[in-house]
Amino acid sequence: MAKFTCILLSDGSKCQVLFYGIIGDCPALKVILEFIGHTGYHCCFYCYIHGIHVGGRGGKRQYYFENRMQLRTKRTYELESIRAVETSSNVYGHLGRSLLHDLLDVPLPNSIIVDYLHVSLLRHTRAIIQQVYAQLSPLERTKFDSGLRGQRFPHFFNRKLRAVCDLAFVKATELRNLLLYALIPHLPPFLPKEQLAHLSLYVCSIRIIHGKKCFGDKSSSMSKELFLTYYQDHSIYFEKLHNLVLHLHVHFDQLFDKHGSLCYLGTFGQEDLIGSISKNYHGTRFHGQLITYYYEIDFALRNKASSHDATDEKNIDGPLDQTDLSSMTHDIIQHHLTVCNCGNFDQCLRIYRRCVIDKKVYHSLIYTRRNSTISFLVQYYTNQGDPSFGKIRYFFTSNNKTYAVIDHHEV
């Protein structure tokens, strides 16, 4: 399909398709962009960092921390790719002119999105975990692996953690859980505090830009500041890991500002979609028609559900799974007396095992079907506005309002 071509629909209306950008891991981007690979000089898609070869014959390219980097612009990116075609040579990493110049509506390199699942998780996180694991004694490795296997998560986590000894079989989502939630809590008994603090810089940097803007417009700049400190001191704690995937993290703040949070910038969802379509084809084997077919089904289902959203949203929050544990009411009778004058405790007070708050289900300790999940652990704020943590014993309603009884956890 040519750029700016409109699609004529069956009802006679026209629909214009805009091609936003290209996302992929580094080897895939290298091919589609006609760019030098990570073993060459000037291999960054966003800047002109040169790189240094270390290790002699059979060594590696390393991209050490630089205070000032010259970024590629859309004009220089286009001109250098044309020069590469005319001279049949490597021009600052360009080996030719990519067909994406004529296809994408957002000019290169602004439309290039590196897949953080490959760069951050499958490459850099895996590499630092391997080096940390190599530092540990056999007994320490056993204890560390045992702690990871026993790590419990809320019920909406789809995957548990695997031990580092099974790292070859660990998937990207498991590495994400390990990096964001389990690595720092499990390592203090085994690592010096300086190295642990160094790792914390990377974990916090990724967490800040992984989801919503926790710090508003300052989120990306705060994340970059943490990462630059991590990048600058990286050679003190890890050997030969100043590779391209580490350097690409310098540009994550730009990706966050231009394209959104990291949790949305992944190729695995599309890979799963294409894989599913390839196995469950209907009438044709052409991927374009099949993808359109499934997207039409998805749009139809979403449009049908949207008409009920206005009424559903009003009733979705609140307690559920009522229980008949009247023996617990003595803990909350005093509270009931302050908010209600009915004097009928048995009729007014209701005990519940679960509660939906902002479309999220929270469990309590009396919900026995939670198995090994820990959706009863919550952070809450005291009357003074101080953050605290605790376990939800149970939920109850009084005077048509919902409350939770929480056992405070000392930090």
Regions found by a protein language model. Name each.
Residues 1-174, 186-187, 191:
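Domain-level detector for long, ordered catalytic/regulatory cores in large eukaryotic signaling
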Residues 131-411:
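Terminal interaction-prone segments of large eukaryotic proteins
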